[in-house]
Amino acid sequence: MAWSKNNKRQGLKRLVMTSLLMAMICIDVMAGNAGDSTSCAVGRVEADFYVGACVPLGNYHDGDGKLSQLLGIDVRYNIPHTKWDAGVFLHIACAFRDYDNMGSNYQNNRTCGIGLSTAYNFRQGSRVNPFAEIKLGYAINDVVGRHRYDYGRKTGVFFSPVVGVELLSFLRVSGFADISRKGFHSAGLSLGIVVGGHKKKDKNEK
């Protein structure tokens, strides 16, 4: 039984990490095929609000990792005449682990990340825009609800690589990995709604 639980947990982690790797490969291929290094004029400021699901990364007292929730908001400034943006973020994700597989003996490790971000948009302004992003900032780690292992509240560095694609300038699908403190790392997928930052109409267009 323990062997089955461990394999299930490892399989879930491999699925998430494989998805991230495949997304990075797809972005690289699409960027190579784009063949256009020029940037497209878009709105200077944009924001996206996102929700999603995540799983714990790494071992923490041999707990069985379970699916949990995440949410966040990004505000970005699109740097003129480039494909880069820079901004700020608030990201909240949980690393949920079950310790008896009965739902009554668990711990939910929460991370709140606040900081700065930068991203490269491979096809900025197009209907399909792959991107790669780095988030770096301040992490607040605590435990939500029941405490199997007393932890308290601690702070540290928050780091998160993100890859994804923006569709039709208003939907944003992302895969990420959050790194902060042992027992609190997580990886997952999110879906966001983008406000602003749309492609500007060419002055020559009627």
Where would I find each of the regions flagged by the language model?
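Cleavable N-terminal export/targeting peptides
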Residues: 1-44, 199-206
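Residues that define the transmembrane beta-barrel architecture of outer-membrane proteins
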Residues: 41-47, 65-71, 108-114, 128, ...
